[in-house]
Every structure is written in structure tokens, then in C-alpha cells.
Amino acid sequence: VPTPTLLFVHGALVRDGAWWWSPTADLLRERTGVESRAVTLPSCGETDGPGAARGGDLADDAAALRLALDDVAAAGGSAVVVGHSYGGTVLAEAGAHPAVEHLLFVSSYLPDVGSTQGSIMSTEPDPVTIRPDDAGRIVLDGYDVESFGARFLQDADAATQRAAWERTTAQDLRAFGTPTGAAGWSGVDSTAIVCTDDRSTTVGLQRRHAERATRSVELPTGHHPFITRPDLVVEQIAAFLR
């Protein structure tokens, strides 16, 4: 059986997916031979193409994932697609693709058709504070490196927290307001990882969405287990690849 390619779709308000996924990418390659690629999201300003200046909405982010999946399919391969947090909403929009072998949701969402990222987050008792800027984007509001680290990466060291903070970015407001047009997780083999020490997304919200996955597993980590416990994440990926 050919080894699939792993595509990683990062969460909201950050850039450089390759950096976020790299601790797991390295261990995954070593243990399974699976190579990883990060999908760049136009809504986070991550494109060098003609659309870079205009940002993008959920549909543009989904198109970026579809393009990456088309590349995998053109090479005769299959893909495992990982969505972290907001990335799961991108998977819902674009996950029903012939190249997809498995979807992995990490502290994430499996939304119904017509859901918006903004409405999903608004149900949280202590939502991440954001504000609009003057360019049609939203930015994190009221955080510094210490408070960001304490909320999103409390199980990482200070150097990692700082490197993560330096990769936060503004995101196109439309990404939070675009209703999903598909439930791409439906009918696709999937795993949901619930992070039980997550200080960003409540365990209750994670569990409600995880019930929709083919299987779910709970890990004792903060919001970014692929940084802090790559061994546990690789263990889960290896399990469904067997």
C-alpha cells in the first residue's frame, strides 16, 4: 500500500503551518515514512499569488486545500488531512475529495452546513478575545507573549511560546463569517483528538464535535499537542494508517 501524504491545515490567526506541525512531522517521518506538507491559508495572508493583497475567506482557504489535494491525486497518491482548530472548518468545506484517505481533527470542529467559525466560537464561555483592525481583518486582542503562552501553549517551554507568539497574524474577517457550504467530514473516515487540558477551546465543545467523527480519542494536552506531545499524535496517526 503506498504511503499517504499528510496535509496540515493550521488554525485561526496564525501563519507558517510548517513550523507548528514540524515536531510531529519529523517524528512521523521517522516512525512511519509519511511526509507532511502545510497548506497556506489566504485568509491569514499566506499566499504569494495575485490574491495575497486581498486576503481571503473560508472558500479561498478551502480552495487552497483542494489545490494541495489535487496535487496529491495527480501524483497518484492519497492524503491524510489534519485540521487544527479553525482548520477543521476548512476540512468541512473541502474534505470530501477523492484523494482523502482520512481526516484528523485536533481540538477542532466538524460543523454542519451553514455554520460559521464566528458562531461556533461565540458559544464558548470565555472566548478568545479578538478585535477588528482597519483593514477588514481581525487580530488577537489583549494578549502578550506570556498570556498567549499561558492560554494556548501552557505545556510548552518559554522559547516555544515566544516562537508561536511571533507567528500570530491578522486574519480576514470574512473567514469567520462565511457559512460552510459542505460537511466534508460526513462519510469520510475520521479521527477527532480532544485535548483535555486545552485552555483555548473548552473540552465540552471539542467533545460535541468529536462525536461526529468515526472515532475520537482524548489526550492530556493543551491546544497544540502536535507541538508539545508529538509522540501521542504520531501514535494516533500510526493507528489509523495500520
Language model features by range: what are they?
Residues 3-48:
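Conserved HGGG/HGGXW glycine-rich cap/lid loop of the alpha/beta-hydrolase fold
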Residues 8-13, 85, 108, 195:
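Glycine-rich His-Gly loop
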Residues 82-87, 91:
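Gly/Ala-rich beta-loop-alpha elbow adjacent to hydrolase catalytic centers
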Residues 96-140, 172-175, 201-202, 208:
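Flexible "cap/lid" loop of the alpha/beta hydrolase fold
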